[in-house]
Regions:
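Long, low-complexity segments enriched in small/aliphatic residues
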Residues: 1-58
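Long, contiguous, secondary-structure-rich segments that constitute the structural scaffold
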Residues: 49, 53-69, 73-212
Length: 212
């Protein structure tokens, strides 16, 4: 049975009601400790947590990693550079993502897509950072305005691996996996970052990559 198929609502006379409310301040405003507003949202080619769209190589090619979009002035003040890693912190958790500079982003606000999970990223779960405050009437969460801060993540090396089978290398400071096409067959692209010295990189490469 389809909900509201007959046009009625859960009111005494089955008619819809408009509820007038007074515009309220944010339940958790920004502060010196949490100076940014985290605005989670969607990107063009993915749906929710990518349980279906994430299986498509074509849809995964457009944007392959979780990221935080930030105004260049904010990035300069925070010591963030395009393409490097940043950690988004809120009172509820942290996420490590790529930095994307955009003058279209409002200063003081950062955007981050919520599609990535522990299945395809090391620490890209943006939804885990959002507070659980909801509107008392509609139940709608105040998910577009969680106070946050963004700090640089220092690593020694960036790279990526292409593989026809899923990879889970050890000792990575960051990783994000996406589907990819290799000729007529599919596989995965693993974007990664390490924080190791030269000897550590050599040992990691020997343990991770096939000989030859």
């Amino acid at each position: 049975e389809r909900l509201f198929a007959e046009g009625g609502f859960f009111t005494p006379d089955t008619r819809a009601r408009f509820v007038a409310t007074t515009l309220a301040r944010l339940a958790s405003p920004v502060s010196p400790e949490w100076p940014c507003v985290l605005n989670p949202g969607r990107i063009r080619d993915q749906w929710h947590t990518m349980t279906r769209t994430g299986l498509s190589c074509r849809l995964s090619t457009h944007i392959q990693e979780p990221y935080v979009e930030i105004h260049p002035d904010d990035a300069s003040r925070l010591g963030l550079e395009q393409g490097t890693l940043a950690r988004i912190e809120t009172p509820h958790g942290t996420a490590s993502v790529r930095v994307l500079l955009s003058r279209g982003q409002q200063p003081g606000s950062v955007f981050a897509p919520f599609h990535w999970s522990a299945q395809n990223s090391s620490a890209g779960r943006i939804s885990a950072l959002v507070h659980g405050i909801t509107d008392p009437i509609s139940g709608q969460p105040e998910s577009k305005a969680t106070p946050a801060r963004v700090v640089p993540v220092r690593v020694s090396h960036y790279g990526f691996l292409l593989s026809r089978s899923p990879l889970r290398p050890q000792r990575l400071a960051y990783w994000a996996e996406s589907r990819a096409m290799f000729g007529t067959s599919s596989g995965t692209t693993l974007h990664l970052a390490l924080d190791l010295d030269a000897a550590g990189i050599a040992a990691w490469r020997h343990a991770t990559l096939p000989a030859g």
